[in-house]
Amino acid sequence: MAAPDLAGLPVTIPSLAGQDDPVWQMSTAALGEDYIVKFAWSRAAARFVLHQIRILEMLAVEPAVPYLPEVVAAGTSPLILVTRRVRGTSLFKVVDGIGRDHAARQLARFLAALHSDQVRRRAEAVIGPVPAWYPLATTTALRERFGALVTREEQHSVGRWCDWADEILARPYPFPQVLVHGDLHGDNQVWSAAELQVVLDFENAGLGEPEYELRGFPGPDMGPGVELLTATMRHYERLTGRALSVERIMAWHVRHALGDVLWRSEAGIPLADHRSPSASVDDLAARLRELNINIR
């Protein structure tokens, strides 16, 4: 896909700290004022950019999945993906000012389309039965290393949650897998005036369970409480006829939320909400209580 109008536009490259691992040697940069370019400088990272190009091309086939970025140019020699810039704000920054039900209805519309059987079949024809990839912390790592960040009592709770998550996720999954985005957090969404404009960054997309997709919706930074999660689950069931398991979502969430705290703390990076590991444990305990999940 060629776009000669892009020639000569300045590229603004962001700071690239913390990308010593070849897997992460890719970046997104502004191309002029109206475009965004995705590129990589290692073979490992290039596979993710190429994967996203193929996924977006497949998802744009009618009936297209809503809220996709507009691909302006894509190529493999050199490997590059250019999309049209969409004005707006991360969900993380606006979630407190958006009605939970209104936001959930839009998110469920995107998820219902992405998770459809038709999209899964198209994806398997393009990329094969590739599982979604994201480096979630293992429960073993959380048991062994999280205790250095919190009190003994808090680590006891973390250990119980890990045991519970292992037990829940070991149960046979009764439904076919779907194509999941794989990394659907607030910064991968652009919102404007309470309306979802676009969902970004499909390089982790692959087969998985819908509950895995929603592992970040309980928080942190998704607003107080778990209303966005429960409203999204409700609208998702209305659109798809498929009720999601809140236990499986929260089992994935244990690994997601605590794993994020672990790697940020060990890397010397502030937590996403700029609070402490102990506060993150308290927040997770509150979410579990609000969802009536009692882990002994």
Where are these regions (language model features)?
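An alpha-helical support segment within catalytic cores of ATP-dependent transferases
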Residues: 1-12, 117-182, 241, 279-296
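ATP-binding pocket architecture of kinase catalytic cores
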Residues: 14-133
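Conserved catalytic motifs of the protein kinase core domain
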Residues: 32, 78, 175-177, 195
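A glycine-centered beta->alpha junction motif in the catalytic cores
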Residues: 42, 82-97, 116-119, 139-147, ...
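Active-site Asp-x-Gly
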Residues: 46, 177-179, 185-186, 190-244
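Short strand-connecting beta-turns/loops that link adjacent beta-strands
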Residues: 76-78, 193-195, 254-257
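Helix-rich C-terminal or lid/interface subdomains of diverse kinases
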Residues: 215-296
